[in-house]
Amino acid sequence: MRSPSAAPIRHDLVLVGGGHAHIQVLKRWAMASVAGARLTLVVDRPVAVYSGMVPGFVAGQYSRDDLEIDLRPLALRAGARCIVAPAIGLDTGTRRLVLDGRPPIAYDTVSFDVGSTVAGLELPGVREHAIPTRPIGEFVRRVDEILAVARARDAARLVVAGAGAGGVEVAFALAARLRGERRGHGEVLLLESGPRVLPGYAASAAARVLAAAAARGIVIRTGARVTRVETGAVHLEGGERLPADGVVWVAGAAALPLFDGAGLETDGGGFVRIRPTLQCLGHDEVFAVGDCAAWTAGPGLAKAGVYAVRQGPVLTHNLMARIGGGHLRSYRPQRDFLSLLNLGDGGAIGTKWSVSVEGRAVFALKDWIDRRFVRRFQVLDREGAITPDFAAAPMPGGDMLCGGCAAKVGESSLTRALERLGVPSHPAVVLGLAQPDDAAAVETERGEIVAATVDSFRAFADDPYLVGRVAAVNAVSDLWAKGVTPRFALAQVSVPEAEPARAEETLYQVMAGARAALEADGVTLVGGHTTTGLELVVGFAVWGFAASADTLIRIGGAAPGDQLILTKPLGTGVILQADMRARARGEWVEAATATMLRSNAAAARAMVPLRPSAATDVTGFGLAGHLGEMLRTSKASGVLHLAALPALPGAVALLGRGIRSTAHPENARARRAMLVEPDAARHASLDLLFDPQTSGGLLVAVPRERGPALLSALRAAGDEAAAVIGEVAPPRPDGALIRVVATG
């Protein structure tokens, strides 16, 4: 997250896509950024796939960990914002990048490294019955579908449409995988619409492919143009129907619709035209590299990853030079490049100029090149440990305080301050300081019960739209926990000091996110207040109406025998802290983000008809703190089962590595009122009890006989992680509020 002491932002550089060139920009930026420039990475998913290793993955030579690059920690190492949202358009007039599902973002300079899609998807049945190899990340996720088809039949026929380099490698990879799984009766059929395989490659390389295919039982047909795909078959031009149990579509590159209507000059295929500096023609502020770009300073370049790799250093220099006022360099593509085709079984074909070679040594070279390249950008391993290549590099985050609900005053400090203050009284107060709860409630002179709450926190990410959404979801949660439907809200936003246009953009993004969340819950934003300060702080006052004082679900009604049900998984605190340090995998942060964005509205609607004894929402004080308050107010004790706690992916692993939210030590004071059994003291999930939650779930005490019905209703409503985590018990003679056991 951007430090409040950082230089004022004067230039917004936005990278769209996590391709082979942009990852080089990120790594270089981590070593030497440009003062006053804010770097933003926009991707549709937080993981990039190295395309050169995908055939090896299909063949079973690599795991996903071998070929995936986690973009989020790489971006955070560079001090960049990371926004996960598909880019769907560009407005060059206003310099806005159009995103799917959220407002456009502003740029001063924008660079595209978004690749391409597969040609021919518009043909009948292709989208429905074939698996395209682009987007490459989606193809990797669907490889198991292809293999499942082959495994389900003794003599499955897999058809690969397109015999360029990609199609050849996929066909050989599938054949090798079938042989490796002893499914030798399966058949791989490679179809090419043109007169020969490997169009554009040396004839000697094509001859080697034909010979290697014959030796491995791969059938190749040229002059076979597919016109339609249906369940169980492909149709060729001329009317021939070929049986096919599975179809992989590798029929060349096509442009993405991203640049349609953007006012950028494109070639006949829709690829954006660039000059040697990698800038788009007529728009110096727009750069493009890799497959999405069309080269204009000479013969067109093949759609091959090697060009994006070689463009990376030039792009990095030119982006920095444009911001800093330096001289831009020209990219000079090589006249030919070494192409290495994986045959899937330990061999490979290499070709450059008109020469081709084949053998295990060729694959060994390819494997060494590919693994070395990917390792340069892998910040974390599968378990979240820092990889050797990044172990010595400076860590972002430092001693920065956590944002979100971890930025609250600790429970003990809050309690002592209120005790010193004293409790004012008024006959209209139904819930107030005399009976602390998640929300306040007062009775009007007309007998209406108005429930209200206020909540705010420091930004937990450099994404004001996301912060606004989460802050709104978090604020209304207090009312949902009381069984009250929120109706109206006021905003309180402190925007970091900046030039007027950037301050306006920050405020707009915050309020757009907040409004999206509030309106989804039926809440109308009716006003608010803004200030400027050192950092972004977002809060809301929210109120609604209860039918009567008796319908309020209070925190203090839990009774012995009640089941304790938690509706959301735990771990947002440690994941957000790890994210500040670039120590959290992108998929972990995405899971945490999804749970923070999930409103407790559905859970409340499932809860209210089943008449719970008590409820609260789990936020900054952690599960132990909020449960302790429930039990203390209810004059009861409770039993928690650590094995039953739902946890976000990565949370327990990060806690095991010693990472803690800055609020964790204060929350851990709750252990003084706990009896932790010896088996629980050694349990990996113990520290989850003290992890501060941002926009956490509801903690519900419900009579045991209604517990199963509530759990079923919660899961049916979308709270799939909801779980029974313990039970309420009578007060203990030793005074302990919570007894913690490992298992039930």
Pin down the residues of each PLM region:
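FAD-binding core/adjacent interface of flavoenzyme oxidoreductases
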Residues: R2-R10, G79-A161, V248
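Beta1-alpha1 glycine-rich phosphate/pyrophosphate-binding loop at the start
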Residues: R2-R81, V160, V168-Y201
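C-terminal auxiliary extensions adjacent to catalytic cores
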Residues: R2-S3, I9, D345-A393
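A Rossmann-like FAD-binding core segment of flavoenzymes
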Residues: R77, C82-G89, G93-T94, I105, ...
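Short, well-ordered coil/turn residues at beta-beta hairpins
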Residues: D113-V114, E237, V250-A251, V289-C292, ...
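FAD-site-proximal beta/loop scaffold in flavoenzymes
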Residues: E128-D154, G232-H235, R241-R310
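A conserved FAD-binding loop/helix module that cradles the flavin
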Residues: D260, C292-N342
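Helix-biased detector of long, well-ordered alpha-helical tracts
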Residues: A391-G744
